[in-house]
């Protein structure tokens, strides 16, 4: 069905800029954008349906390119403890922290994980999200990593949202491998990753490169295996210290390196040369009350593409609003509203390997867009909350009104 969407203003986000078309119209057909431009220039095509958007601003559908949306349990009790002065180390010694999420995730059935994750993903969708990445990483063995990735696939089948699944088995050391990190990396490379990839559950491979997780050398072994299986890689890097994980990621043409508070100018140069996207996660920065800012000037100076994401997870960023992350990106990281919007559209698409098909309003790309109740694009970063999406369209079909 061909649909003509008109009486709107479009922030197309081509080349990562607002690239505004005033009094715009969009023609969609077969799930794609067939034409976009000024309303007065609409080509003489026969539309099966004409939709008046009432002067709304239209942007690409939002893309949350870094989430841990599938998990069991609840860690709000730890939040209370931390506010009372209990350290993370003390919480971990009591069996809390990521270990508690691993236990709860392992204990939960696939259907239970699906039900809880569905609510979180739907909350993001109500914010205008049409594409989301979901990582595993709370199973830490083949059976439970498979369970998490199956849930991610099922969410993409059951909900009107595009889901990309990332294997993050190298997220933390499982209790059965205490003191044997190298053995665990071997297990991921030799057993887990080949099996999960063969089952079609993996779109990319991620790891956590940090003193409290895995070393650059261990991550590199994982990257070599992933690339050998034809899978792109991503990396949690430079969140708590500088191990030059982002440079390692760039060496393997990673789709993205994420967090990056402690990255250096050398790392930024390497990422720029490789085309690796910097995914900034202000929710975790805020929730943990961190003070080390990502090097925004270096990222801009060297032309690194910058994305923003929610980092939705139970321990460090229980954020169910990607629009809130737009504001945090501006207020915490000194991004401009234009940079922030590019960070959840075109650059987020690139961070998922979807830059050719998603993230901007261009002919031939998927017809994913949101019509907003706003006066100008900067309002999306300005307002804290509010029911701003007027219509959400995915693959040319309206999914909310």
Curated annotation (Swiss-Prot):
Mind listing the UniProt keywords for this protein, alphabetically? Answer: Cytoplasm, Histidine metabolism, Hydrolase, Iron, Metal-binding, Zinc
Per the record, the domain of life is Bacteria
What Enzyme Commission number(s) apply to this enzyme? 3.5.2.7
Annotated residues for binding of Zn(2+): 66, 68, 236, 311
Identify which top EC class this enzyme belongs to: hydrolase
Name the needed cofactors. Answer: Zn(2+); Fe(3+)
As for subcellular location, the record says:
Cytoplasm
**Positions bound to N-formimidoyl-L-glutamate:** 138, 313, 315
Binding sites annotated in the UniProt record for Fe(3+): 66, 68, 236, 311
Q: What are the transmembrane regions?
A: none
List, in alphabetical order, the GO biological process terms annotated in this UniProt record: L-histidine catabolic process to glutamate and formamide; L-histidine catabolic process to glutamate and formate
Record's GO cellular component, any one? cytoplasm
Per its record, what are the GO molecular function terms? Answer: imidazolonepropionase activity; iron ion binding; zinc ion binding
Query: Which pathway?
Result: Amino-acid degradation; L-histidine degradation into L-glutamate; N-formimidoyl-L-glutamate from L-histidine: step 3/3
According to the record, how does the cofactor bind?
A: Binds 1 zinc or iron ion per subunit.
Question: Reaction catalysed?
Answer: 4-imidazolone-5-propanoate + H2O = N-formimidoyl-L-glutamate
Principal location listed in the UniProt entry: cytoplasm
Q: Which InterPro entries match?
A: Amidohydro-rel, HutI, Metal-dep_hydrolase_composite, Metal_Hydrolase
**Which NCBIfam families does the protein's record reference?**
hutI
Q: What does this protein do?
A: Catalyzes the hydrolytic cleavage of the carbon-nitrogen bond in imidazolone-5-propanoate to yield N-formimidoyl-L-glutamate. It is the third step in the universal histidine degradation pathway.
Question: What's this protein's family per the entry?
Answer: Belongs to the metallo-dependent hydrolases superfamily. HutI family.
The protein, known as: Imidazolonepropionase
